From Swiss-Prot:
E.C. designation(s): 5.4.2.10
Disulfides per UniProt: none
PROSITE patterns assigned to the protein according to its UniProt record, in alphabetical order: PGM_PMM (PS00710)
Keywords assigned: Isomerase, Magnesium, Metal-binding, Phosphoprotein
UniProt keyword annotation of Transcription regulation present: no
Post-translational modification (record): Activated by phosphorylation.
Pfam families cross-referenced by the UniProt entry: PGM_PMM_I, PGM_PMM_II, PGM_PMM_III, PGM_PMM_IV
Entry cofactors: Mg(2+)
Active site residues per record: S102
Modified residues (Phosphoserine): S102
Cofactor annotation comment: Binds 1 Mg(2+) ion per subunit.
Protein name, as recorded: Phosphoglucosamine mutase
Naturally occurring in which organism (per UniProt): Xylella fastidiosa (strain M12)
């Protein structure tokens, strides 16, 4: 088991444990040493971040650790996580680093890494970095220290990349959209891009102050987006999370359209156009209604473990190009190397424009089973929850209650100190009662 890396890099409360300036300094130094192995030239690393105030501190710490190890650094500033993945590849960097805690509040932060190809690091590289953290800090001789510069054209590069993900004739003229950028990394680039494509735009969550990222806005607070869509008479709403790798939507009535819904819209249209390849990949948490709807269309569907890295792995192994999670992590591997909220939104909008459908019309063939997830805070290691006898017994009873009619999942979060409980059943009352009973047991055990 990894000592430092979770399912999405390293994440936690600022100033505590691993998310401290001294640890991030050592982390940067470890990355620089791993990248420098077996080469005569200085490695080059891109650093991007979201808008939380602690990003300045960790940017400086990473920069210092990398430079001390003899690595050059390019500072990108606030940019979506997938933009850093793209830029790492196109600028021929040896690695990319993103300082972000995604959808978490401002007092959390984290570190994500990308390989030279713009993909998440493999387990072997993560293990090498962890081993290097335990080794003594290295400061190379002065003449071998790394150099630092700021990249000035990152925004333009990423906008052109995003526009290239749709057909040249694609336009949003005549469409009114509400865009919620969560006061996060997409706050400047997403409105610019969607306006360039011709949309009439109402933008919210675009005034970051370092402390308000994800606060009442973004993909984890769709009520703000839904209300704005209804009040403005928009055709639909689009919400990103704090670092821009997730996207969720609302239709014109403000109804939530999650990642399972968006997967269906894309899979159905791509199959008809011939773009869909291989298997569509969801996760263990994907709604059973999605699996049924895709099966009706003759589209193969498999489930990976929860986490976009596992979805990516399953897509590569199966030769697929489309996968994702209900949370809004969508992978369109024929367009981007990682989950990209902006690119995914453009793919959905391109389908709607091509077919002449509203978002609600595009979802008429999908009938989801009632499903609900609750998060129970857990003070200690969340993994311990699933091993407690009373919790295991309650889980067995919950699964028996919905046997033949639904599913129950209990899992520790890989990114937060919570236990996630999901119940799915063909009857909403059965679903809610089963969820409440299991959640009460977990809360009492916490």
């Amino acid at each position: 088991m990894s000592r430092y890396f979770g399912t999405d890099g390293i994440r936690g409360r600022v100033g505590q444990g691993l998310i401290s300036a001294d640890f991030v300094l050592r982390l940067g130094n470890a990355l620089g040493r791993v990248l420098a192995q077996g080469r005569d030239t200085r490695p080059m690393v891109l650093i991007g971040k979201d808008t939380r105030i602690s990003g300045y501190m960790f940017e400086s710490a990473l920069e210092a650790g990398l430079v001390a190890a003899g690595a050059d650094v390019q500072l990108i500033g606030p940019m979506p996580t997938p933009a850093i993945a793209f830029l790492t590849n196109t600028l021929r960097a040896d690695a990319g680093v993103v300082i972000s805690a995604s959808h978490n509040p401002h007092d959390d932060n984290g570190i994500k890494f990308f390989s030279a190809m713009g993909e998440k690091l493999d387990d072997a590289t993560e293990a090498a970095i962890e081993a290097a953290i335990e080794a003594p800090f290295l400061t190379v001789d002065s003449e071998y220290l790394g150099k630092v510069k700021r990249t000035r054209d990152a925004i333009g590069r990423y906008i052109e990349f995003s526009k290239a993900s749709v057909s040249r004739g694609f336009t949003l003229r005549g469409l009114k959209l509400v865009l919620d950028c969560a006061h996060g990394a997409t706050y400047h680039i997403a409105p610019m891009l969607f306006r360039e494509l011709g949309a009439e735009l109402v933008a919210i969550g675009v005034d970051p102050d370092g402390l308000n990222i994800n606060a009442g806005v973004g993909s984890t607070h769709l009520e703000t987006l839904a209300a704005t869509v209804r009040e403005s008479g928009a055709d639909l709403g689009i919400a990103f999370d704090g670092d821009g790798d997730r996207v969720l939507m609302t239709d014109a009535q403000g109804r939530t359209v999650d990642g399972d819904d968006l997967l269906y819209v894309l899979a159905r249209a791509w199959r008809a156009s011939g773009r869909l390849k291989g298997t569509v990949v969801g996760t263990l948490m994907s709604n059973y209604g999605l699996e049924q709807a895709l099966g009706t269309l003759g589209i193969p569907f498999i489930r990976a473990k929860v986490g976009d890295r596992y979805v990516h792995q399953a897509l590569v192994e199966s030769g697929g190009v489309l996968g994702g999670e209900a949370s809004g992590h969508l992978l369109c591997l024929d367009r981007a190397t990682t989950g990209d909220g902006i690119v995914s939104a453009l793919q959905v909008l391109e389908v709607l424009r091509h077919e002449g459908l509203t978002l609600s019309q595009a979802l008429l063939g999908l009938h989801k089973v009632p499903q609900k997830t609750v998060n129970v805070c857990w003070s200690g290691p969340a993994r311990a929850a699933v091993e407690m006898p009373e919790v295991r017994q309650a889980l067995v009873e919950a699964q028996a209650a919905v046997q033949g009619r639904g599913r129950v999942f209990l899992r520790p979060s890989g990114t937060e100190p919570v236990v996630r409980i999901t119940v799915e059943a063909d009857d909403v009352v059965l679903m809610q009662q089963t969820l409440d009973r299991l959640a009460d047991v977990v809360r009492d055990a916490a």
